[in-house]
Structures are given as C-alpha cells and as structure tokens.
Amino acid sequence: GFGRGQVKPEGSGVAFDSAQETFTARYTHETIALGFAITEEAIEDNLYDRLASRYTKALARSMAQTKQVKAAAPLNNGLPGLTFKSGDGVTLFNASHPTVAGTFSNTLSTAADLNETSLEQAMIDIAAFTDERGLKIAASAQRMIVPSALQFTAERLMKSQNRTGTADNDINALRNMGMVPGGYSINNFFTDPDAFFLITDVPNGMKHLERAPLTTKMEGDFDTGNVRYKARERYVFGVSDPRGIFASPGA
C-alpha cells in the first residue's frame, strides 16, 4: 500500500509514493493417505461384507480426524515461542510482525487467560491494527474460537446480561456492543487448554487450499488374493495475513 496523502502546496507537483512487496506466504500441499486390506481367507469365510463396512467407516473417520488435526496445527503451533511461522518469518501470533512502517502485534502484550479484561483488551488491540504502511485499518473481531475447557467461560462472557465475576450491577459491554457478532465456537483439537483465538474481518487470513479432494479406490492383489482399499487427498492449511486472527496463549 501507500502512506498517507501529502499536502500539495499551490503550484507544486504531486508527491509520489512507491508500492512495495513485503513477504510471500507459501503453501505446500501435503498428500494424506491411508489404506487397509481384507485377506482372501476372510472373503472366503463370508466376512467380507461385515469387515468392509466397518473398516471403510473407520477409514473415513481417520481421514476426517487427520484433517481436523491439520487444520488446528497452525493455531496450536503458532503461539508465541512455538514453531509455525507466517510468511514474515515470525510465529503466527507475535508481538513484532515486521512491516514497512515498523511492526504490529496480533497477540496480547501480556499473556492472559480468557476473562472480561483480556477479551476487552483483545478488542482494543485488534482495532489498533495497521497495514504495511502504518495506516489504521479499523479491524474488528468476528468470532471467537476456544478449546473445550473454555466453553463455559466463553458462554458466560458472551451471553450474560451483566458483567461476570463481579457484584457490580454493570452491563456486559461485550454483549451489548456486539463486539463478537459471530459468537464463539469450540475446537476440540486445540492442544492448549487456556488459549483463545479471535477471527477478525481482515481478508486473506487463515486459509484452507485443496489440491485434490478425498477419493477412495479398491483393487485386488493377485499375489496374495487380498482386497486392498485406500483413501487419499491433498490439501494444506496456512495463513496469508496474520491480521486475520488474534490470540492469547493464556497466562
């Protein structure tokens, strides 16, 4: 992008700015596959139908579970100090994402558990997001994602009419102002029981790209007489713009 517009004195030329490429987010598709075999003897003993039905359901469940784990991996491994990095070379959730104009943060400056104070601070921090040239983009949170351990905390924070955890007769500002219009969802594949995440309205954030959809194949093996089944798909989960998501790893 460009910096702020410049005042043009009367009779002077227009100031020109230069657009710059920042970083490249790379996505490497993974091939996910799994198979099983039913022996020729099992087929002869009339076990084929029963085993095939049970095993194919188990195969589908395994493939679905793998996709869920892969989908959660950027969030699980992108917390401060872990291994998943965005295209700018730092962890997905970082206080110092580099930009042309300086840095920006998509995590709390002081890690905190999910409560009214930390969630309100997250709203303030998201609203302060800037683009590559330091211009404010007026970002806002759209949906919160929590591990199952935080589902009850999230329910109270999002839906109580009054403030939670206090005897003060104050309204629940987060609820009344509609700060998280999409509510919250639970992800059972998060590995940190006290981390919470906020999807923002910044486009090109978290992405799922599919190179080849799930397919299944079956064939007989001449040598053993076994019947073999396999399932296969290719996809990748990643992030293009870290501003698309905000997180706190918990205290």
Language-model regions: role of each:
Residues G1-T31:
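Assembly/oligomerization interface modules of large self-assembling protein complexes
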Residues H29, D45, N77, S86, ...:
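Generic structural "secondary-structure junction" signal
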Residues G1-G5, F16-A19, P74-G81, V236-G244:
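Noncatalytic linker/hinge segments flanking ATPase motor cores
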Residues T91-E132, A138-R143, A149-A251:
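Sequence/fold signature of self-assembling virion shell proteins
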Residues T24-L82, M144, Y229-A231:
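Long, contiguous amphipathic alpha-helices that act as assembly "spine/axial" helices in icosahedral shell
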Residues D49-R54, R61-D125:
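Alpha-helical scaffold segments that mediate packing/assembly in large oligomeric complexes
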Residues R4-K8, V14-F16, F84, V90-L92, ...:
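Polar low-complexity intrinsically disordered regions enriched in Ser/Thr and small residues
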Residues A25, E30, E41, L82, ...:
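Flexible, active-site-adjacent loop/turn segments at secondary-structure boundaries
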